[in-house]
Amino acid sequence: MRIKICGITQPDQGQAIAQLGATALGFICVPQSPRYVTPDQIQGVITQLSISVDRIGVFANASLSQIEQVVQQTELTGVQLHGDESPQLCSEIKQRFNHLELIKAFRVKNLEALAQITAYFDRVDTLLLDAYHPQLLGGTGHTLNWDNLAHFNPPLPWFLAGGLTPDNIQEALTRLHPTGIDLSSGVERSPGDKDLTKVAQLLTQLQQFSSKKFP
């Protein structure tokens, strides 16, 4: 299972989280976000990494040129679109950056919103399902209605996000079967300041879950 910790801002925390067992780090490239980091800050984290992990830049309603500017200045391995990007724009971004993983995030408000995801199946590499919030794009601490996802079985890999914590991760994975999980506020002291104790607790919970599932 992929384990993505999003909203990394500090090099020492990025390195520690990778060492604890995360498989991906997310960097927020949305200037309005309290977790925003510049390309220089992103690269500052990446150069400190001694372990190979996926490095994902998170954008929301950014132009192709804005994404390109960040990609050219950093060693990202993937781009995540967390806004209202159309299937057509996703195709253009994938074509332009075909060497990078393209993740499309969806803030799922209801079953109707879930149905709209099908239009993206052949446009992106990976899906991410997050909780809906009328003002915030992510890191809300709100959980999804997991019941709505009971029959979600897309042909692509997908991350479950939205209010996940060390305390509820086992329940989430008992009820749903994502190929990855994405946490931000659930392992933070404050926006952008990760709580390494909580990250360690998360990995412990995942190990316990795995041993129960595959004794």
UniProtKB/Swiss-Prot annotation:
HAMAP family: PRAI. It catalyses: N-(5-phospho-beta-D-ribosyl)anthranilate = 1-(2-carboxyphenylamino)-1-deoxy-D-ribulose 5-phosphate. Belongs to the TrpF family. Gene3D superfamilies: Aldolase class I. Its EC number is 5.3.1.24. This is N-(5'-phosphoribosyl)anthranilate isomerase. It is an enzyme of class 5 (isomerase). PANTHER family: N-(5'-PHOSPHORIBOSYL)ANTHRANILATE ISOMERASE. Pfam families: PRAI. GO terms for biological process: L-tryptophan biosynthetic process. It comes from the Bacteria. Keywords: Amino-acid biosynthesis, Aromatic amino acid biosynthesis, Isomerase, Tryptophan biosynthesis. The lineage of its organism: Bacteria, Bacillati, Cyanobacteriota, Cyanophyceae, Oscillatoriophycideae. Coiled coil: none annotated. The gene is trpF. Pathway: Amino-acid biosynthesis; L-tryptophan biosynthesis; L-tryptophan from chorismate: step 3/5. NCBIfam families: PRK01222.1-4 (NF002298). It comes from Rippkaea orientalis (strain PCC 8801 / RF-1) (Cyanothece sp. (strain PCC 8801)). The keyword Isomerase applies. One of its GO terms (molecular function) is phosphoribosylanthranilate isomerase activity.
